[in-house]
Amino acid sequence: GVVPSKASFSMHSILVNHFLRGAWYPKGGAGEIAFHTIPVIRKAGGNVLGNAPVQRILLDSQGKACGVSVKKGQGLVNIFAPVIISDAGIFNTYERLLPAEARALPEIQSQLRMATHGEGGFTVFVGLNGSREELGLEPTNYFIYAGDDLDEIMNRYLASSREEAAKNIPLLFVTCPSAKDPTWETRHPGKSTLAIVTFAKYEWFEEWKDKQVSKRGDDYEELKKTFVDTIMQAVFKLYPRIEDRIEYISGGTPLTNQHYIASPRGEIYGIDHNIARLQAEAIATVRAQTAVPNLYLTGQDLCLGGFVGALQGALICGSAVLKRNLYADVARLKKRTQATDSKK
């Protein structure tokens, strides 16, 4: 999520190595991850609550985390537990969910000083009338750049006014989820989807942050439409057959991310994973264990951005909570699975 001059070589190497081995996609779409995870949680005695946003982390008289307060309708419900794990991100966890006295702890302030917000994201979701074959879509991720000096084009873009930026977007990530899913055509014959992502500054949309979702006014919608139109003109060059086959299109700004996934400034990869974040001191400081007893961090902010980065954060956090090396468990599981497969 950063320009090359601010990117860690080691992190980039991990990413390249990941894709050199081939990518993967869950059959049935991303929702299958939650669908198959929830029963495991419930089987272990846990539960999963929807429409129950956490309002604050509860501390006991000794300053230890002992539960969370969640919103239910117009009221609040306190849920108590011996261990509290937060995947809300460093800024949300420390600045929004913890009481002031815990937030003021030197260790927490030290972590906050080392963290910076990642850049906001702008996403376009497209529904298409036509199959993958009819529209020439591919199970491929495309990165489209407006030039070969990525630092220069991105810095100029992020320094420009919102009106200028909306017409001159230098970087796009284009993916076709429906083409990647081998079950898609059976479930949704003759239909396809695209998702396009780029970066956008939170400040470009900040004046509408207090407006109600879907009621932010004509100026906001016009700015959003300009971004969408510019993005789609580039996508039409990649997939020309889709231009007159669009049935649905929706743009999401940093405010959209702020509303639906509670990212403080519309960021999609959590905190900024730049070189400073990956220095030894920062890695040693931002750990799963927090200065508040019984409170742990997990997810992107603990490790790296993206799904696999968040998954690594979960393994690190789980190891800390259980006081057990889960990476060793995974290695043993892999070895056992390979041995079983070889006998088939």
How would you name each of these model-derived features?
Residues 1-44, 51, 259-277:
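Active-site/ligand-binding neighborhood in enzyme catalytic cores
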Residues 25, 55-187:
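Mid-domain catalytic core of redox enzymes
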Residues 47, 52-66, 70, 251-264:
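Beta-rich nucleic-acid/ligand-interaction surfaces
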Residues 59, 63, 323-344:
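Active-site-proximal substrate-binding core of FAD-dependent oxidoreductases
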Residues 129-252:
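C-terminal segments that line or cap access tunnels to active or ligand-binding sites in enzymes
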Residues 85, 126, 196, 235, ...:
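Hydrophobic, well-ordered secondary-structure elements that form the walls
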Residues 1-4, 169-175, 237-304:
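A glycine-rich dinucleotide-binding beta-alpha-beta segment and adjacent secondary-structure elements
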Residues 300-322:
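A conserved FAD-binding loop/helix module that cradles the flavin
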